[in-house]
A protein has these predicted regions:
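Hydrophobic ligand-binding cavity/cleft-lining segments
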Residues: 1-46
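Intrinsic-disorder/low-complexity, polar/charged segments enriched in Ser/Thr/Lys/Arg/Asp/Glu/Gln
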Residues: 10-16, 55, 67, 80-82
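Hydrophobic/aromatic beta-strand elements that line small-molecule binding cavities or substrate pockets
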Residues: 16-17, 46-49, 67-74, 84-87
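A short, structured loop/turn motif at beta-sheet edges
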Residues: 20-24, 50-53, 72-80, 126
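Signature tryptophan residues that serve as conserved aromatic anchors
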Residues: 36-40, 58, 83
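Short beta-strand segments that buttress and anchor functional surface loops
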Residues: 55-63
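Coil-to-beta-strand transition motifs
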Residues: 63-65, 74-80, 99
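A conserved amphipathic terminal alpha-helix motif
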Residues: 88-130
Length: 130
């Protein structure tokens, strides 16, 4: 029996940022709901999987509907922070390519990188690894 193949989400982002400190320094920040509200004020997140030192997975509601994850991967003395956002604007038509969706993707990536680099600067200043 053939099934229906679901469409890929309109917003599908994967990003990586190296932070020169161990996952144990990052995990409490990632797990803090106040951090989420600062980073994504237009999204309502609910934890679907608390991975502890490995990160968090969330269901996303609000300006977008879907899922998001931060995975903390230990690499040498530091951590690669993987950020995944797979979501759609609620109730929106989903053209294959849309200037509005492209701008939304770019806006989300740019905002995330600003948060990731601010976190990197703050934590590496406190726990710099060489």
């Amino acid at each position: 029996m053939l099934g229906v193949v679901p469409l890929a989400p309109a917003i599908d982002i994967a990003d990586e940022t190296y932070v020169g400190c161990p996952p144990a320094a990052l995990a409490p920040v990632v797990a803090e709901p106040a951090t989420w509200a600062r980073w994504w004020p237009d999204l309502r997140l609910s934890v679907t999987r608390d991975r502890g030192i490995k990160g968090q997975q969330w269901a996303v509601r609000g300006a977008l509907t879907g899922s998001m994850e931060i995975w903390l991967e230990p690499i040498g003395p530091g951590t690669v922070v993987h950020w995944f956002l797979r979501a759609d604007p609620p109730g929106a038509a989903r053209p294959a390519r849309s200037g509005g969706l492209d701008k939304e993707r770019q806006r989300r990536v740019k905002a995330w990188k600003a948060h990731a680099f601010a976190l990197k600067d703050r934590l590496e200043g406190a726990e710099r690894v060489t």
